[in-house]
Amino acid sequence: MPPAMADNLDIWAVDSQIASDGAISVDFLLPTGIYIQLEVPREATISYIKQMLWKQVHNYPMFNLLMDIDSYMFACVNQTAVYEELEDETRRLCDVRPFLPVLKLVTRSCDPAEKLDSKIGVLIGKGLHEFDALKDPEVNEFRRKMRKFSEAKIQSLVGLSWIDWLKHTYPPEHEPSVLENLEDKLYGGKLVVAVHFENSQDVFSFQVSPNLNPIKINELAIQKRLTIRGKEDEASPCDYVLQVSGRVEYVFGDHPLIQFQYIRNCVMNRTLPHFILVECCKIKKMYEQEMIAIEAAINRNSSNLPLPLPPKKTRVISHIWDNNNPFQITLVKGNKLNTEETVKVHVRAGLFHGTELLCKTVVSSEISGKNDHIWNEQLEFDINICDLPRMARLCFAVYAVLDKVKTKKSTKTINPSKYQTIRKAGKVHYPVAWVNTMVFDFKGQLRSGDVILHSWSSFPDELEEMLNPMGTVQTNPYAENATALHITFPENKKQPCYYPPFDKIIEKAAELASGDSANVSSRGGKKFLAVLKEILDRDPLSQLCENEMDLIWTLRQDCRENFPQSLPKLLLSIKWNKLEDVAQLQALLQIWPKLPPREALELLDFNYPDQYVREYAVGCLRQMSDEELSQYLLQLVQVLKYEPFLDCALSRFLLERALDNRRIGQFLFWHLRSEVHTPAVSVQFGVILEAYCRGSVGHMKVLSKQVEALNKLKTLNSLIKLNAVKLSRAKGKEAMHTCLKQSAYREALSDLQSPLNPCVILSELYVEKCKYMDSKMKPLWLVYSSRAFGEDSVGVIFKNGDDLRQDMLTLQMLRLMDLLWKEAGLDLRMLPYGCLATGDRSGLIEVVSTSETIADIQLNSSNVAATAAFNKDALLNWLKEYNSGDDLDRAIEEFTLSCAGYCVASYVLGIGDRHSDNIMVKKTGQLFHIDFGHILGNFKSKFGIKRERVPFILTYDFIHVIQQGKTGNTEKFGRFRQCCEDAYLILRRHGNLFITLFALMLTAGLPELTSVKDIQYLKDSLALGKSEEEALKQFKQKFDEALRESWTTKVNWMAHTVRKDYRS
């Protein structure tokens, strides 16, 4: 591949001949002040380069002043602008990637704490010096607390036994319960497993009860070997641990075998579970090595502990409940408003608690100016300071006011068509910028003094009066070009003013309860309880009217005793601008029953910002198992964005569970790191990542290997894109293979735990099987050899340039649907493959082996592309090609069940763009969908006409397979239809959960999930406002419509197939 000069800054990748081990000119700075320039191989290790330099040093002045070579190491400034000392000299120069090719020879440092900071900065993609430079008291306080928290976690690991360490580092994956429909897939009620001893060719198979504990398998294997080898090989079952063949996964503990996810999957897929008996001494050796690293980390941390804070002076403070003055601020001026001098500008301000407006918004006067707009205007809100809730936020919107006649001429710098406008009194208001800030600081002190707020210019859709209460309370870090608002909070002249502490709130509630009887909630009769139940049964999107909210608040004790799940609606009914109601609610919350975790998730939505409510919600989540927490981790990371302060119950909870379970830790790491580039959350996610790394030093090496591999793949993908136009596909593939064979790439991409699944080892690339795909972003198709029993290879796709977060969300929903169906005793053989965003528009996708797209199956069965889509026998014939007899019957059964699952799922989620290249089938019969670029009913259209007219895909070739190729097989089709109806009703019973999970993702910035209106599709598809009978009738109509209009799908597929055949 020829050199590409598109990005001259990336000297380590782009400006190089990737077909050869190119050299680069590096400047070396010696401690004596001598400067030497050498040509060194890009792929050389730091140790080799040091030896090269030392040979040259002899020829330069003042050599005699230098110490021994081992007394020195190199230092550089890395890609995150951090000064990094290169202590690990086995690393290659092209992997170190200095910002410039300059290496400084320095005396070996003895400060291990600085080295750890440097490693953490490289790993999280953000130098820790950036946090120091902020000089933000909240950031510093949080980092100090989290450092103490993480160090305590490390200390707790030191006392673990090796088996507890194994449980923490390689946690077994369990299923919650035993499924009834597994019985027919066992062999006479027995489970068949294969076991072989490590470093031995002996393989033993057993038929055992699925309810046995793993230790019993150890015992059976040892007994069987004793019968062959005799007593010289006698050993105890406790001397071994079962390891899944070819995976970093261990099966141990007290759970029955059938509850281990690996064994469950083997049974469902009718494959043989295969284990290796590993000696415990090998595990203990791994344990001891990590303990050494942990003890070193403890020493590193303790060597650089921050100095203790000086004792605080006792000072008099006041509480806001003693202040009955109206809340007011001074709007001083605005800078860099980016409007013409003649354009008049307003500022609108509103006080919010969640999405609730606490009082009327206030608007400044209209002024115009060139750059600075000076108001010096006092804005007074219709609420007293004493009634301000703790989580009140002040939201600003800056907008230009233009006459309709002058609009066309005056808006060239505002780009009005991009955002919504408000028309009032013959004028048009165009948004310019928005910004939010908290009324209280992270310590609960009422803000005072001058504040400069650097604003954001990107407006989401459907804002209330252009204010964006759901937006971040962080100001724009790119201050140089951002609109700035200068405001002044009133000074507290006598003493600082705080929100009352918890004990004062409870005292106030007790005082109210014992005093005014009007404040005490009453009890409702049967009639009121029936009305209350009807209100509480509504879905989370339903709006409450004023009378309904009053009724819920009045009957709050009935809610607590009879309808504890009503808590979200009670919280929406309280008047948050009334201190008496807030105090009584906090007291009530202390005795409110714990909600099931799935119901408590709703309380983390933006509508519920109160600190104590969110602490209550997190308390409910503590009941979750690790497997259940993993299921909802995507949403829990997203709702961190709703937290106004760094130190909160949710961030501590996630850190605690991640540090207790390395599998959760890996996914938390990647969910955070994939968005650390986003300005609004860069600091928040960055400091949480730092805390995780400090508390999981043993995991850093694994994560660093993954980061290094992904950086290599990103570089390779960029090179392929740059040269795709110049080279033929064959030449491009050859150049890709040449690159992957280079030692630097081979080492970086080998023997790493898959980011998609830490149990899977990506051992060695099958370079000749690797390729890049034809789509615009040239995804990399990578094939690895597999060490797993009965598995030849493992495939992953690396994408760079596509946002995978919407695919992640859709696949998560498919996984949840699969779980809910199984809980109800219905297994629809869903296949939600792995997908993980790992960076800015980049990530990994799992390749499902032995599968083909419907388009390829149809094309391969026909000589003419135009008729391929209409060949109803193609799919059944393809299944017959790989299956016969009983296997064919099982394949058709797999197809029938999975087709039912995906029909219902694609209808409920509104998955669009369903053509024959994003529906696939495994050779075993499982059907599954891929590529979820359009969801929630956002179907593709052309010239205003929807290309997809059916609610879900159900073509006649699918029905042909379901009916086993027999046209009149109504029994099989009737069973398929019944499966679809049962599956739909099961999902509908959990409709509130789906709405909650999508609502929690509103802040993710997904293109098709930007407002509550987008979630309305779910409410409609699940018919949540109707009875079950009405809902089922609606689904039956949709089913008939899909069947009736399936010819339109075939026409679309024909057009797609013809285009595909033409392109190839």
Curated annotation (Swiss-Prot):
Region listing for Activation loop, in residue ranges: 929-955
UniProt key word Secreted: no
Location of the PI3K-RBD domain: 188-279
Effect of loss of the gene: Mice have defects in autophagosome formation. Have normal bleeding time but are resistant to thrombosis after arterial injury. Mice fail to induce tumors in a model of prostate tumor formation induced by Pten loss.
A GO MF label: protein serine kinase activity
Every PI3K-ABD domain range: 20-109
A Pfam match: PI3K_C2
Domain called PIK helical: residue spans: 518-695
PI3K/PI4K catalytic domain location: 766-1047
PROSITE patterns: C2_PI3K, PI3_4_KINASE_1, PI3_4_KINASE_2, PI3_4_KINASE_3, PI3K_ABD, PI3K_RBD, PIK_HELICAL
Membrane-crossing segments per the record: none
Principal location listed in the UniProt entry: cytoplasm
Sequence motif Nuclear localization signal (NLS), residues: 404-412
The keyword ATP-binding belongs to this UniProt entry's keyword annotation: yes
SUPFAM superfamilies: ARM repeat, C2 domain (Calcium/lipid-binding domain, CaLB), Protein kinase-like (PK-like), Ubiquitin-like
Residue ranges of every copy of the C2 PI3K-type domain listed in the record: 323-490
Entry comment, domain topic: The inhibitory interactions with PIK3R1 are mediated by the PI3K-ABD domain and the C2 PI3K-type domain with the iSH2 (inter-SH2) region of PIK3R1; the C2 PI3K-type domain, the PI3K helical domain, and the PI3K/PI4K kinase domain with the nSH2 (N-terminal SH2) region of PIK3R1; and the PI3K/PI4K kinase domain with the cSH2 (C-terminal SH2) region of PIK3R1. The inhibitory interaction between the PI3K-ABD domain and the C2 PI3K-type domain with the iSH2 (inter-SH2) region of PIK3R1 is weak. The nuclear localization signal (NLS) is required for its function in cell survival.
Protein task: Phosphoinositide-3-kinase (PI3K) phosphorylates phosphatidylinositol (PI) derivatives at position 3 of the inositol ring to produce 3-phosphoinositides. Uses ATP and PtdIns(4,5)P2 (phosphatidylinositol 4,5-bisphosphate) to generate phosphatidylinositol 3,4,5-trisphosphate (PIP3). PIP3 plays a key role by recruiting PH domain-containing proteins to the membrane, including AKT1 and PDPK1, activating signaling cascades involved in cell growth, survival, proliferation, motility and morphology.
Protein name per its UniProtKB record: Phosphatidylinositol 4,5-bisphosphate 3-kinase catalytic subunit beta isoform
The organism's taxonomic lineage, starting at the top: Eukaryota, Metazoa, Chordata, Craniata, Vertebrata
